[in-house]
Amino acid sequence: MLDYRSSAKDALILLCDASSPMHVKQEACSESGEEESVSMTPFEMAVKVAHATLRNKVFHAPNDLVGVILFGTTEAVGVSDFKHISQLLPLDTAEAQHILRLEEFLDDARKFKEEFGGSSGDFSLHEAIWQCQSMFANIKGKTGQNKIMLLTCVDDPHASAAPKKRHAMAKATDLNNTGIYLDVVPIGKGFKMDKFYKDLVQLADDEHPLDETPGAERIEDLLRVTRKRIHKKRSIGRVR
């Protein structure tokens, strides 16, 4: 089926987990099979993905929109309706100042705590998704594909909070009804999609097979995975 929106600008929100586990360096398996320390924390890897994405958009898709939302921050910065959710970058075309802002967080790990107050586990994922929906709704003009790419190393964020889990699943169904795609990219080894995110993604998109690529342990692997998924176009088969 033809995708009549393929020539329009796309909109992408990188929804990055900023909770405490994201700021702890993990270990990865070396080529010899031995474990070795990874130089970047999962959060730094997520910011690096955002940085690489913006640089790519500048040269190859300057009309596309990219934003970065954090969930699991102590403060709510740039977001007025929800607690523990912050806007790192607005949903806008890629600009040099946005790239430089991301570099500040990559160059100085203290920048995160200074600006967002540190991490908090008392967030609601459905509110983070809701914030993304609101940003898409405020876009002026038509867009092609609207996508949320969620990056996290935590495979069951609401393990002890059943109501929050139910709310997240309901919000995922809402994404399905509004044509917003949700893609979850795991970071680190041992990530089990079937604990939580498998159901979430399938509720958000019941027409395409779930990508169950194992969690990326190194930044080069994560960049390769995210680059492929960002560029992947979905055929338009649903009537909205």
For every predicted segment, state its role.
Residues 82-85, 93-100, 194, 213-217, ...:
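Low-complexity, intrinsically disordered regions enriched in charged/polar residues
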Residues 27, 31-36, 44, 75, ...:
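Glutamate identity and glutamate-enriched acidic tracts
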Residues 156-240:
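Eukaryote-biased recognition of electropositive, low-complexity segments
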Residues 1-2:
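A short, compositionally biased domain-edge/stem linker segment
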Residues 91, 99-108:
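An alpha-helical interface "stripe"
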Residues 5-98, 147-151, 182-189:
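Von Willebrand factor
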Residues 10-11, 16-19, 72-81, 104-181:
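Exposed acidic/Ser/Thr-rich ligand/metal-binding surfaces
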Residues 9, 25, 48, 57, ...:
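Context-gated lysine
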